[in-house]
Every structure is written in structure tokens, then in C-alpha cells.
């Protein structure tokens, strides 16, 4: 065909694009880099690349009836025959196309052996008639285009095949990537089993590409947002480079003539194309930002020209990118870096000029030594390498930045296994020993808030008052005449509006003998309700009017001392005179003077009674918002240890006040710090005691135990403790002849052993091996 003529001149052009009729799924170029084929669900066309634009040359979707054979998931152009194309159809058919046919329909052969969608097709780089395909059904098939059926079928014994690529240097080798994260290497001469298999990614591996120069380098990309470069020349696949991206990696392509450059595009979210230098994986070397939707296919225009990149996208555009027009993120990046060390050290890296200028203002700091530069770089072509930035590194040791307190606190804290009061007291003592006074005070306040004082037994069952030994008779005897004269006194509670509350339980004898005084003036509560029945329980005397709401809020005059002092009970005539003066005061009504206040006076104090006369405690739920704010304060200050520890100790008392996401963030941060300091036991304890379900499962999902048969050394299956290969039980106890599933102890001389306790009991009475081998064993 005239339109398929080869172009032998040097490639020229500029950044250009053309609109397609439909979104593209894959693109491929011919050997001479003059034409490109675009394939998709509703498009299958060939374009020629002119100096400054694309020209449509051929539409391969012909026929009146639409066919799924034209719905392509992948397309490849043979690099040895310009007239040969292959497509992977979404209905599981592999189709070859012969552009040399004189008819309008260029379809050549159909291979219908796959049962599900074919994800990838690949021609052998040197064998004209060899075609390889990978499908969702988990099989890979090798076709000879001179035959109607496949010549080899490869079963990965795994999930869907995502990509297949022939090695450029090894004639018989190809690589396949799978949905479960594995990569397999196959020899086309041995379809029964793969040559090598290893887990490359955490999740599906969507793509792979062999290095065009180094025969042992294989690049892979997956859903875990990573691009990894593997060295396959060693006995085991070795990861030599890793690039972290911001989205799932859909395509990877090594850049020609640049050993360390690789191009990538994402499957979702990110529409840009990135070119990475795998030696500098933290920032892209170049980016192309022209596409407005997901990029589905990328390919370098010529295998020996690194300047032209072609791409197709779901935005129905086909682009040719010129490398000189690419954006360089390094030009807009901040060349300063800041990082905290594990033990509180602060490292700061900046431009050498910045450090040199700042050092002139700080004569005490040692200037940066130019004899030991951070980066030793050659003088490369500035358009093909990262900018050479000479940086200086300074390390600061901040005062008080030592993290020894964190380790000591984590190791000594008690989080469970004791009553709440003991946990709070223990943790307060730990914080106090480490001179963390605010933390110690916080634990003490938590004990006061959430632990009832009623659990503490009284020092004297007779409720002794003070140190003089004068005891207060039980109030249910109702003989107020026997009370000491220092107690039966006169006081008052000053009210803002003159109405008194029924808070008095001790009254003047004259008032008691007055039968006409049936109610306390200014109160709606009967006096006999306050005092209770003569034969009633003692606690009934302490009841307050908590059920009947008051119409007006009471206002009281607060005492001058917030915490009343405890006084001894003694006869003090001056106290009687003092009380009498208060009773004669014109500001006090008669009945108010007869009431006895709970506020302590100079001569005595009812606070000395071990049991409160009435319940003056607020419920612990009242303080929950305050405790929540306190935990948020510690978290904002960076002390997630305190926030996570209080969450564990208080449990359901405070968990409902804090949203699940915040709790998970605190626990995750604390566990990360513990693991950085290698406090594995404390970390596991926090995971087990965590109140978040997502945290509890951390040590269950990340722990894998591999067991090998002690006889044939082969890995054990998940079916039990019997080896499938040699049909013997693993790790039998020489004493009880059962499988040892826990600690196993054995003799280093004869290699027999068993359960730890069984061997200990056996060796107490015997010196020979319990297996009967005759060896003299010793337990130490």
C-alpha cells in the first residue's frame, strides 16, 4: 500500500493533537514511526503523523453490522511486518489484521479459545508468526499465525492475567502479571510450569515492561500506586528501584536511550503522564498535562528517539508530546526540607546559598563545609537531567527533645487488669516520677471524676469528729438534746430574695418543742419530711428536695475558702457569742436564724463527718465534654500517647464523646510511634485493647506463619497438620505422640523433642531420649 510507505528520514515535529470519534483504549506505532493505530470500544483507525498534524489514513471498522470483534481492549503493531496488526477483543477473541489485503475488510484470523476478555496481546520481537495473549480467564496462549489454533497454553494457577511481555533479549522468556499481585516468568518451551514467580505488589499488577538495554530489568506497576524495577539476573527477583505515585499505575514504558527514565500513566484520578528518573523517585523528571481525562495508552514514537511520546485518552484525543515542551516539576519545587528524627533531633536541608547567608548572622554555628557536598553529580545535559542543587544539611538538638520519657511512659503505663482507680493512681505516679506534672494531675482528676468515693471504707464507724474524740451520736436516735452545745448552734444561708431552702437538719431545741411550727418558713417542704421518722433509716435524714423543682433559681453567698478546713470539736464560748450576734442582726429573720447551715463556722465543721450529709457529686457524664476537650488538647500538642492511653483506660465512659475517625487516628499515630521505637509488646497491647474495630484487626491481618514439614521440608498446606507430600504429621511430641502446635523443645544431639512441659516432666525422672533412640539427653 502506498500509504504504508516507510519513513527513513529523521523524526521532526511539534506538540500536536487530533480529536477522535470515541475514547481510546490502546495505541501502537509501526516500525518506521510514521503511523499510529488507535483502538477502543468504538474506534479502530490508523493515523499518519505529518509535520504538524495527524491525518486519518484508514478506518478498520467496516461492515453494516457492528461486531464485538472490533471492540478492542488492546492493540499491537508488529515490529517486523508493517502490514500485521493484532487486537484483543472484549468478547475474548484475538484478531489479526492484514493491511496488505486489497479488500476493505482487513481482518485476517480469529482465535476464539479464551473464555473471557483478553487484556493483552504481544508479538514476539524477532519471530514473525508468534503471538502471545493474556486473558481474564487466567490463561495465556501462544499462537502460530500459520495455524488456526494455539500451539501452547500457559496456566498461571492464579487470577486474571493483566499483562504479558516478551523479553527483548531472551528469546524464549516472557513475563506475565496477575490480579493477585504476582509476576511470573515463563519459558515458551515449558508450558507446564513457570520458571519463576514472586509477589511484586500489594494488589493487582496492571502492567510490566522489559528494559530495552539491560536484559535483566523488569518494571511493574500496580494498584498500590507504585512502580517497581526488578533485577531478574539474580536467583531471586530483587527490587532495585521503587517509585511512589499518587494513583494506580496503568501503563509503564521505558524511555529509549535513557537508562533510568520511565514513563507512566494512571488508571484513574490523575490524567497526567509522568517521566521518572528511578534514581530520584520523589519528584517526576517531566510531566505532560495536556489530557483532560484518564490516559489509557502511552508509547514512545521510535525505539531509538527519546524526544517523542504518543498518548491516547478517554477524552477522545490523540497527542504527540515533544519532550522539550514538558513541564519540569523540579523547577517549581521547594528545595528546602525539614524532618524530625526518632529521638527529637531536627534536620534541615536547604540551598547552600541560603545556609551561607544565614551563617553570617549566626557566628556560633559551624558553617557548611564545601569539601563534603551532599550530592555528587556530574555535569550532564541540563535538558536531560535534574538540576544540580548544592544543598547543606544542618542537624539541631533541641533542648528537652529527648524522647526517653515516651519510652519509659509506654513501658510503665498500666492500661488494663486493675480497677479504674488503681489504673489512674498508677499512671499518675508514673508521670510524676518522670516530672510530667500536668499529666499526673490529669490522671488524678480522672480518678476523682469517674471513681466514687463511697468505695473507700470509713476510718471510724461512729463518724468521729475531729481529733478530740468527741463523737456525734447517731441521728436516727433523734435525741438532739444530747448533742454537744458546740454543734447545736445558730447559723444561716443567705438568700438573695429572703426565701430559705429546706437544707437544715439540726435545729434549736426551742424550735423542736414548738408544736405550732409545722413547716419551715419560706419552704414548701414539711419539717417532718426533712427529719424523717424517728425509727427511720439514717440515710433518710440526708435526703434533699431533689424531686420538686424550685420556681426560682437560688443564689448563695459563696464561702471565702474553696476547701473548708477540718477543725477540732471543742467548747468555745466565743463561738456562742458570735452566733448570737448573728441571730440579733437585723438582716436575719427569726426562722432563718434558727436554721443550721452546712457551711462550717469557726467553732466546728460538719465536713469532718466521713459520710456526706447529702449527695453533692455531679454525675460523671457531666464532665465528659471537659474530658473530651482535654484529650483533644493533648492530641493537638502532639501527645497522642496520653490521648490513646486515656481512651483505653476509660473505655465506654468517654468513647461515645469522640467520633470513630478521630479515635482511629489517635490509635494509629500512637502505634506508629511505638513501632518506631521498637516497643512491639506495648504496640500489640494497644492494638488488643483498642476500642476501634479497624485497629483490633491490625495484628490479625499482618501476621503470617509458614510451617514446613519436618520430614520432607516442604511447605504445609492449610488443610491441617498432615503433609500432603509425605503423608506424615509435622512436629510430633516424643512423649504424647501428638502434634506440637505451641512451644517445641528438642535435643540438639538427637533432634527429638516435643511439648515443653512434657519434656520437662520426662527429664525429671529419665536421662534417655523419650523417642527410644538411646541418646542421653539433658534439659537445661
UniProtKB/Swiss-Prot annotation:
- Where would I find the C4-type zinc fingers in this protein? 708-730
Enzyme Commission identifier(s): 2.3.2.27
Reactions that this protein is recorded to catalyse: S-ubiquitinyl-[E2 ubiquitin-conjugating enzyme]-L-cysteine + [acceptor protein]-L-lysine = [E2 ubiquitin-conjugating enzyme]-L-cysteine + N(6)-ubiquitinyl-[acceptor protein]-L-lysine
The residue spans of each WD repeat are 67-107, 113-153, 156-196, 200-240, 244-286, 290-333
Pathway-wise, it operates in: Protein modification; protein ubiquitination
Residues given in the record as Zn(2+) 3 binding sites: 747, 750, 775, 777
Q: How is its activity regulated?
A: The GATOR2 complex is negatively regulated by the upstream amino acid sensors CASTOR1 and SESN2, which sequester the GATOR2 complex in absence of amino acids. In the presence of abundant amino acids, GATOR2 is released from CASTOR1 and SESN2 and activated.
| EC category name | transferase
**Compartments, as annotated in UniProt:** Lysosome membrane
Residues annotated for Zn(2+) 2 binding in this entry: 733, 736, 755, 758
Residues binding Zn(2+) 1 are 709, 712, 723, 726
Which cellular component terms (GO) are annotated to the entry?
cytosol; GATOR2 complex; lysosomal membrane; vacuolar membrane
Give any single GO term for biological process. cellular response to nutrient levels
Pfam annotation, one family: WD40
UniProt main location, coarse: membrane
Q: Which InterPro entries match?
A: WD40/YVTN_repeat-like_dom_sf, WD40_repeat_CS, WD40_repeat_dom_sf, WD40_rpt, WDR24
Function description:
Catalytic component of the GATOR2 complex, a multiprotein complex that acts as an activator of the amino acid-sensing branch of the mTORC1 signaling pathway. The GATOR2 complex indirectly activates mTORC1 through the inhibition of the GATOR1 subcomplex. GATOR2 probably acts as an E3 ubiquitin-protein ligase toward GATOR1. In the presence of abundant amino acids, the GATOR2 complex mediates ubiquitination of the NPRL2 core component of the GATOR1 complex, leading to GATOR1 inactivation. In the absence of amino acids, GATOR2 is inhibited, activating the GATOR1 complex.
Family note: Belongs to the WD repeat WDR24 family.
Q: What is this protein called?
A: GATOR2 complex protein WDR24
Amino acid at each position: 500500500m502506498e500509504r504504508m510507505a516507510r519513513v527513513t528520514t529523521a523524526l521532526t515535529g511539534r506538540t500536536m493533537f487530533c480529536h477522535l470519534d470515541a475514547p481510546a483504549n490502546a495505541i501502537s506505532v509501526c516500525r518506521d514511526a510514521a503511523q499510529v493505530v488507535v483502538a477502543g470500544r468504538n474506534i479502530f483507525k490508523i493515523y499518519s503523523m505529518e509535520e504538524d498534524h495527524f491525518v486519518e489514513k484508514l478506518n478498520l471498522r467496516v461492515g453494516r453490522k457492528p461486531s464485538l470483534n472490533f471492540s478492542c481492549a488492546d492493540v499491537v503493531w508488529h515490529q517486523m511486518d508493517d502490514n500485521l496488526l493484532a487486537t484483543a477483543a472484549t468478547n475474548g477473541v484475538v484478531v489479526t489484521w492484514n493491511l496488505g489485503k486489497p479488500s476493505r475488510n482487513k481482518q485476517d484470523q480469529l482465535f476464539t479459545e479464551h473464555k473471557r476478555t483478553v487484556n493483552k496481546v504481544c508479538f514476539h520481537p524477532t519471530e514473525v508468526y508468534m503471538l502471545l495473549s493474556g486473558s481474564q480467564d487466567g490463561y495465556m496462549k501462544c499462537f502460530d499465525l500459520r495455524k488456526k489454533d494455539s500451539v501452547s497454553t500457559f496456566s498461571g494457577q492464579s487470577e486474571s492475567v493483566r499483562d504479558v511481555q516478551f523479553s527483548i533479549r531472551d528469546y524464549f522468556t516472557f513475563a506475565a502479571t496477575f490480579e493477585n499481585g504476582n509476576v511470573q516468568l515463563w519459558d515458551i518451551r515449558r508450558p507446564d510450569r513457570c520458571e519463576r514467580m514472586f509477589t511484586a505488589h500489594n494488589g493487582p499488577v496492571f502492567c510490566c515492561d522489559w528494559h530495552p538495554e539491560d536484559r535483566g530489568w523488569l518494571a511493574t506497576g500496580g494498584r498500590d500506586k507504585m512502580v517497581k524495577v526488578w533485577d531478574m539476573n539474580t536467583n531471586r527477583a530483587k527490587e532495585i528501584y521503587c517509585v511512589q505515585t499518587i494513583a494506580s499505575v496503568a501503563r509503564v514504558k521505558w524511555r529509549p536511550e535513557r537508562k533510568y527514565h520511565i514513563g507512566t500513566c494512571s488508571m484513574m484520578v490523575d490524567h497526567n503522564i509522568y517521566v521518572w528518573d528511578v534514581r530520584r523517585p520523589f519528584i517526576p523528571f517531566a510531566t505532560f498535562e495536556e489530557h483532560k481525562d484518564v490516559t489509557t495508552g502511552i508509547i514512545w514514537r521510535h525505539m531509538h528517539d527519546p524526544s517523542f511520546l504518543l498518548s491516547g485518552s478517554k477524552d477522545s484525543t490523540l497527542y504527540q508530546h515533544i519532550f522539550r515542551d514538558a513541564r519540569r516539576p523540579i523547577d517549581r519545587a521547594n528545595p528546602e526540607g525539614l524532618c524530625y528524627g526518632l529521638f527529637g533531633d531536627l534536620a534541615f536541608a536547604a540551598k547552600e546559598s541560603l545556609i551561607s547567608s544565614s551563617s553570617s548572622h549566626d557566628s556560633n554555628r559551624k558553617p557548611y563545609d564545601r569539601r563534603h557536598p551532599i550530592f555528587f553529580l556530574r555535569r550532564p545535559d541540563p535538558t536531560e537531567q535534574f538540576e544540580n542543587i548544592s544543598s547543606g544539611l544542618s542537624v539541631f538538638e533541641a533542648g528537652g527533645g529527648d524522647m526517653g520519657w515516651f519510652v519509659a511512659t509506654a513501658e510503665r503505663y498500666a492500661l488494663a487488669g486493675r480497677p479504674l482507680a488503681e489504673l489512674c493512681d498508677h499512671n499518675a505516679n508514673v508521670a510524676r516520677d518522670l516530672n510530667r506534672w500536668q499529666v499526673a494531675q490529669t490522671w488524678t482528676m480522672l480518678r476523682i471524676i469517674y471513681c466514687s468515693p463511697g468505695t473507700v471504707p470509713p476510718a471510724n464507724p461512729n463518724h468521729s469528729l475531729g481529733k478530740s474524740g468527741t463523737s456525734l451520736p447517731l441521728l436516727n436516735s433523734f435525741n438532739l438534746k444530747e448533742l454537744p452545745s458546740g454543734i447545736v448552734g445558730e447559723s444561716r444561708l443567705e438568700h438573695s430574695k429572703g426565701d430559705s431552702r429546706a437544707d437544715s437538719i439540726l435545729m434549736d431545741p426551742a424550735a423542736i418543742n414548738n408544736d405550732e411550727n409545722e413547716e419551715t418558713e419560706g419552704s414548701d417542704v414539711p419539717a417532718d419530711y426533712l427529719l424523717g421518722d424517728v425509727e427511720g433509716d439514717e440515710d433518710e435524714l440526708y435526703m434533699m428536695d431533689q424531686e420538686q423543682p424550685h420556681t426560682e433559681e437560688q443564689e448563695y453567698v459563696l464561702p471565702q475558702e474553696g476547701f473548708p478546713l477540718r477543725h477540732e470539736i471543742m467548747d468555745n464560748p466565743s463561738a456562742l457569742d458570735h452566733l448570737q450576734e448573728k441571730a440579733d442582726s437585723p438582716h436575719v429573720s427569726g426562722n432563718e436564724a434558727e436554721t443550721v447551715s452546712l457551711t462550717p463556722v469557726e467553732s466546728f465543721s460538719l465536713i469532718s463527718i466521713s459520710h456526706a450529709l447529702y449527695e453533692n457529686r455531679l454525675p460523671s457524664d457531666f464532665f465528659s465534654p471537659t474530658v473530651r476537650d482535654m484529650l483533644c488538647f493533648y492530641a493537638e500538642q502532639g501527645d497522642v500517647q496520653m490521648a490513646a492511653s486515656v481512651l483505653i483506660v476509660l473505655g465506654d465512659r468517654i468513647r461515645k464523646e469522640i467520633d470513630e475517625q478521630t479515635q482511629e487516628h489517635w490509635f494509629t499515630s500512637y502505634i506508629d510511634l511505638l513501632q518506631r521505637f521498637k516497643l512491639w509488646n506495648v504496640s500489640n497491647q494497644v492494638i488488643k485493647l483498642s476500642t476501634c474495630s479497624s485497629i483490633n484487626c491490625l495484628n490479625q491481618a499482618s501476621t503470617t506463619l509458614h510451617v514446613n514439614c519436618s520430614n520432607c521440608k516442604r511447605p504445609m498446606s492449610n488443610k491441617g497438620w498432615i503433609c500432603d507430600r509425605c503423608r506424615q504429621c509435622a512436629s510430633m511430641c516424643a512423649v504424647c505422640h501428638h502434634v506440637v502446635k505451641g512451644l517445641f523443645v528438642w535435643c540438639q544431639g538427637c533432634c527429638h523433642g516435643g511439648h515443653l512441659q512434657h519434656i520437662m516432666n520426662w527429664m525429671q525422672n529419665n536421662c534417655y531420649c523419650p523417642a527410644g533412640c538411646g541418646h542421653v539427653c539433658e534439659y537445661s
